[in-house]
Amino acid sequence: MNELILNLKGDVSVPVEMDKILPEKIQEMSLEEISGIELIQGNKTAKVSEIFDVELKESDVAKVTINNCCKKVKRIGEKMTSGEIVVNGDAGMYIGVEMKGGKITVNGDAESWVGQNLKGGEIIINGNAENYVGSAYRGDWRGMSGGKITITGNAGSELGEYLKGGTIVIKGNTKIMPGIHQNGGMIIIEGDIEGRAGGEMMKGAIVVYGKILEPLPSFKFEGIVEDPLVKLSKKDAGTQLKGTFIKFSGDYVNTKPKGQLYAAIENNKNLI
């Protein structure tokens, strides 16, 4: 196995698209071949070696490491199927888009559309992420369907838009409308939500440990539950939560919704 190490040479003023650099694709390539790969940069192309200092070494796993990265470096890990990508620094838009397997770790912040249409694998952002984490493409109604996304900091608006499956975990706070149009999967938010969680939600579950600042009136109070086992389907083994929660169902702007919303009672007594 090989590890490709890319060290960004300097400031990038025009966005660079990294979708051609995947762990599984570079295993049979030489250093010279990798250095000569043409990357889209704005309305032109540039060779990998023009933007990065390139190293190649043996590794236990197929791996790509990007050092000194910035938010102008986009589409990292797009359609990745296996291996590992480590980003030291910030990452641009569309990281892990349509990813099916493997693992991406960003040691920094990420721009919008982290894990758009994610199908499998794992993405960890050790920082903040902007809008549309785990969302669908514009105009599509099929969002993330598998895998796991973890944001250790805060996230922006409309995370989990049209979520169908998989898990999104936010360790910090989120802006408005997490789980909008959600149709499966689970969103766990350990911090506060600015409001409107689960708008037009049909299926799936949202768990909020912090405070829901602007709850939607179209959710139905189902009771107080202790250490609930959250099941997303009849065959699902379930996810065991610890603590006391206020349970709601919704969103009743839809017909016969099966969405579940759990709010930790210690931070949401005003919702009872």
Curated annotation (Swiss-Prot):
Enzyme Commission number: 1.2.7.12
Assigned keywords, A-Z: Methanogenesis, Oxidoreductase, Repeat
7 X 13 AA repeats of [GW]-X-X-[MLP]-X-X-G-X-[IL]-X-[IV]-X-G: annotated segments: 77-210
Each Sequence repeat, start to end: 77-89, 96-108, 115-127, 141-153, 160-172, 179-191, 198-210
GO molecular function, one term: transition metal ion binding
Stretch forming the signal peptide: none
InterPro entries linked: FMH_DH_FwdC (IPR054942), Formylmethanofuran_DH_suC (IPR017550), Glu_synth_asu_C (IPR002489), Glu_synth_asu_C_sf (IPR036485)
One GO biological process term: methanogenesis, from carbon dioxide
Pfam families assigned to the protein according to its UniProt record, in alphabetical order: GXGXG
Gene3D superfamilies, A to Z: Glutamate synthase, alpha subunit, C-terminal domain
Pathway: One-carbon metabolism; methanogenesis from CO(2); 5,10-methenyl-5,6,7,8-tetrahydromethanopterin from CO(2): step 1/3
Catalytic activity of the protein: N-formylmethanofuran + 2 oxidized [2Fe-2S]-[ferredoxin] + H2O = methanofuran + 2 reduced [2Fe-2S]-[ferredoxin] + CO2 + H(+)
Summary of subunit composition and partner proteins: This enzyme is composed of seven subunits fwdA (65 kDa), fwdB (53 kDa), fwdC (31 kDa), fwdD (15 kDa), fwdE, fwdF and fwdG.
Annotated function: Catalyzes the reversible oxidation of CO(2) and methanofuran (MFR) to N-formylmethanofuran (CHO-MFR). This enzyme is oxygen-labile.
Family as reported in the entry's similarity comment: Belongs to the FwdC/FmdC family.
Name of the protein: Tungsten-containing formylmethanofuran dehydrogenase 2 subunit C
Species per Swiss-Prot/TrEMBL record: Methanococcus maripaludis (strain DSM 14266 / JCM 13030 / NBRC 101832 / S2 / LL)
Lineage, opening ranks: Archaea, Methanobacteriati, Methanobacteriota, Methanomada group, Methanococci
Name of the coding gene: fwdC
